[in-house]
Curated annotation (Swiss-Prot):
Originating organism: Tityus serrulatus (Brazilian scorpion)
Family membership: Belongs to the non-disulfide-bridged peptide (NDBP) superfamily.
Protein name: Hypotensin toxin Ts31
GO biological process, any: regulation of blood pressure
Entry's Gene Ontology molecular function annotations: toxin activity
Biological role stated in the UniProt entry: Agonist of the B2 bradykinin receptor (BDKRB2). Potentiates the hypotensive effect of bradykinin (BK) and induces a direct vasorelaxing effect independent of BK, by endothelium- and nitric oxide (NO)-dependent mechanisms in rat aortic ring preparations. Also exerts proangiogenic, antiinflammatory, and antifibrogenic activities.
Record keywords, A-Z: Bradykinin receptor impairing toxin, G-protein coupled receptor impairing toxin, Hypotensive agent, Phosphoprotein, Secreted, Signal, Toxin
TM spans (from-to): none
Taxonomic lineage from the root: Eukaryota, Metazoa, Ecdysozoa, Arthropoda, Chelicerata
Amino acid sequence: MKMMIAVFVSILLLMFSLSSTAMGMETEQQNMEERADVDFTGIADSIIKKIKETNAKPPARFDPATFGENED
């Protein structure tokens, strides 16, 4: 009987976790769509191009290998 309760609680926790993850992904998708719908009227084309290029790049990652010891 205790085993059934433990399994039931585990399943409920798993379902809650999955639903929370799905809701978070949905919110992120909505944020991305809102960002894509920005009105650029009155802004120079060169600035718009730079913004779109920046948004298309993957996020920067720290690479510790680039900070190796200098051989002077």
